[in-house]
Amino acid sequence: MLPFPAPPTTEQQATLDALRAEVAAIRAMQDSQWVDARRAEAVRATVRDALADVGTRTSFLQDAGTCGYDHGTFVRSSDGNWLFRAGILQQQRFVAAFAPAAKGVPDQNMWGFDVHRFNLTLSGHAIDPSITWNMTGAWNSQPDRFVTEGGKFRLLYGLVRKDWGEGWSTIVGLHNVPWDLESDFFGSSRLTTGEYSVFNYRFGMGKHEGISMLWEGTDVRMKAGTYSQLNQASLVWDNPVNLSWAVAARVEAKVGADWEQLSWLSSRPGDRPGLVAGLGFVWSTGRADNPPDTRAAQGFTVDLRAALGGTTLIAQYALERDAVGLPDLQWSSGLNLQASTFLTDVVEPFASGSWMQDAGVPWILQAGFNWYVAGQNTLKLTTKVVVPLGTGEINGQTNISGGLGIMPSGNGCGIVSQLQLLY
């Protein structure tokens, strides 16, 4: 017979069943822990992938640069070496000009609305922040001192500037000729008396193509350059009116207010007080082999500006040959006195008187106020009265009447109300 083990007793069977149950429980627990470990590893892998994706997306965002608004809409590279900015200037106005005529002759009174000026400014820096550029196109409703044809889009500024450090820089292209007080200002958006200074309208050198050097220190700055022309439009190298030689220079010294604050003609309430003295010089020779005969601007100008924390006082004098405000080519002197003060944080009355020797209308007076609706010139309403003291021809050698808002001759006065948007 084969030996067979005796069947387990009841007590032994109970012990075996308990052991089997315990082993099954241990196996189930181990299986659960293994699954949890696999799940944890899967979660960790998902988190790692998500973090890597976020890092990649962030790096793409950094490479794409930033955009926003700062004196115009801008796009800047992540390293700061490239910047593109776009801005606009709009000047909408109502003008009423009165010219009383002799008895029995109808008065020459005119009035109406127009979009006086629209500027599109593109600017920025390239390669690195020391190389800046500016391209400004301008549309004017009618001819004036600086625009020979109205109703056309033309180049107003086109320049490249290189900063060499230690305050030195070079400017090449179409830019302001260093001469009088208004030479420091970009366009007309920062002037107190609206769109023009009468003094600069008559004696100014304008904007011309050339090359200039600029040095700016804490309290002194100087700019000097050579140009194709000085006081009439010339945008090409072979223009018959180009001068044989044309140089201009300006030096300024100040105490008090910093240069950035002085880049706005009006001193605002709360600004640091300051005093600025300026001296400008121009010299040129006509080009006899290029008919017709060209003007040869020569002369000097001095000016003094007191910025008194809400009040601004200005005095200017010029002695100039062949100024555009004269009826003939000759020497003439001129004077401008101007004052403005803030009655509130947003309302600024102003008055000015400009005199020009031997002009058809020697004196031109202005008085009015600025209402800064929003920001520092962002949205500004200028309303003024322009009063020529005299009834002679006011155009001089160029069409200045339309820009000033008065008739060419027989003037009584002009009323100008202009809304400016600077974006």
Segments from the language model and where they lie:
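N-terminal periplasmic/intermembrane-space "pro-region" immediately following the signal or transit peptide
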Residues: M1-Q91, K103, W259-L262, Q418, ...
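A broadly tuned "polar low-complexity/structure-edge" signature
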Residues: V43-T46, L51, L83, F94, ...
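Generic anion/oxyanion-binding catalytic loop in active/binding sites
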Residues: P8, N109, L404
